[in-house]
Amino acid sequence: KNWYNGYRGLQTLRQSLVQSINVNAVKTLEDIGIEKSKEYLKRFGLINEENELDDTYVSRSESVDYNDENLSSMALGAMTRGITNLKMTGAYAAIANDGKYLEPISFTKVVDSTGKVILEPEQKQREVTSKENAFIMRDILKGVPDAMAQGAKHPTIEVSGKTGTTSDIRDSWFVGFTPYYTIGTWIGFDNQNIELSNNNSMAATLWGKVNKIVLEGKPAKKFDPPSENIIKKYVSIRSGLLMPEGSGGGIYEYFVKGTEPTKYEELYYIIYQIDKRNGKLANTTTKDKYIENKKYYIKPEAYKKGKTDYAQEDFVNPPPTEVSEIIDSDNSQNPNDDNNSNNNSNNNNNNNEE
């Protein structure tokens, strides 16, 4: 179940992350598999099999009844024993650091009164994903402060991050980063019976206040631009396939070279002139103020319903076939005349996307 009521139709993974769409997170995990996901959790420091005292992940071998090896826990978070803010922040820092994970440390060095270094811990690091993948994730997460977490925005420095809440808003998270630092905030109680207020953006607001203090005096800065191994393509928001640039229903999206789509979407659309007063096709007497130009997407084959009756509205609601019977007085032409401007055979607004 998503946090919102209703159905929003087909959503890209970018939209799903920005809008916290739970269903698509679960579907993605289902596609890649539990074992593959576990490998990435290990890489990002969220599972530590070498140190049981530092590992909060519960495997199926540890507990058959209560474990984290399921679609709910691994896709949506809020694991059986939870995850510490330190670990979560360390994982996000790897995205900020071009895919390189730096093991969190509490100090950089200890010196005596003469400046001699007494202690200087070695900070372990490893590559957990490519810098190209890290760039795309940074770019996607830049959309969150513009949508769900506006309290985290900074006036001159770019911010990427992600909100997080648990059932009944018992926990509120925001973990994010700038070109300078990665910060994690969590608001909640040790007693899980205590609920927070309905303001699920409170952690983002707190994060924004802390971030502004930390960045005080820092010059304006944006994230590094994409490398030459990143390309941008205009793709359909419905299928993810290529579309002609400038046609409706598409967005520009980044891809790692070699992973971009090569086929064009087979959907096409027709623009119909609709009489806003009754939802029927406008006739030759319909005044401009009553006309709405409405785009209908047509699929090569009929939409097939799944387990529910939910479907993308464009796919199941075909354009109207009846002509409006309302005749506007300053034009006496028969609205059902063969020369009606909405006759499909004469429609000049077809835009085939091949």
Model-derived regions, located:
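Mid-domain, small-residue-enriched loop/turn segments at the edges of structured enzyme/sensor domains
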Residues: 1, 33-89
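Thr-Gly-centered strand-to-loop micro-motif
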Residues: 27, 78, 161-163
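Short coil/turn segments at secondary-structure boundaries
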Residues: 29-32, 39-44, 52-56, 103-108, ...
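Low-complexity, Gly/Ser/Thr/Pro-rich intrinsically disordered linker/tail segments
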Residues: 233-335
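Conserved catalytic neighborhood of penicillin-recognizing serine enzymes
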Residues: 1-37, 71, 113-138, 142-143
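Ser/Thr/Gly/Pro-rich low-complexity, disordered linker/stalk segments of secreted
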Residues: 324-354
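A penicillin-recognizing enzyme superfamily signal
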Residues: 15, 82-267
